[in-house]
Structure formats: C-alpha cells, structure tokens
Amino acid sequence: MSHLVWQKSSYSDAEGADNCLELAQGNGDHRHVRESDNPSVVLTTTAAKLRTFILGARAGEFDHLI
C-alpha cells in the first residue's frame, strides 16, 4: 500500500503529531483508512460505505462515542 496517497483532515495537529485518521483512494471503488500512529494497519472499504459513515458522523450519530 506504499503507492497510496494518504490525506489527513485539516483539523489534525499542524505540528505533525500522530493523532488522526488518514484516508486514501485505492484501485476502483476501494477506500482505505488508517491511524497515523499505526500506519501498518489499514482498513479497506468501499466508497459508498465510507460515504455513509461520514454522513452519519456529520449528523452526530457517533457523538456519544467521543
């Protein structure tokens, strides 16, 4: 997965601390998620599933977990 271009949120620590999730677009419909402090562990999902999750997060469906 070294060929992937990983993207962090603009809300991540600007000083480069390992405190965020990173996303990358893979081949076809694959989307990848990893933690910046443990980049060797990667979760792979589809664009549709990731979109559904992000929309739920924006709507506050997971606020009770933070």
Cite the ranges covered by each PLM segment.
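Histidine (H) residue identity feature
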Residues: 3, 30-32, 64
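A short, structured beta-strand/loop element
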Residues: 11-55, 59
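A charge-rich, low-complexity, intrinsically flexible signal that marks solvent-exposed coils, linkers
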Residues: 1, 45, 65-66
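Negatively charged, low-complexity tracts enriched in Asp/Glu with abundant Ser/Thr
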Residues: 1-9
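Active-site microenvironments of metalloenzymes and redox enzymes
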Residues: 58-66
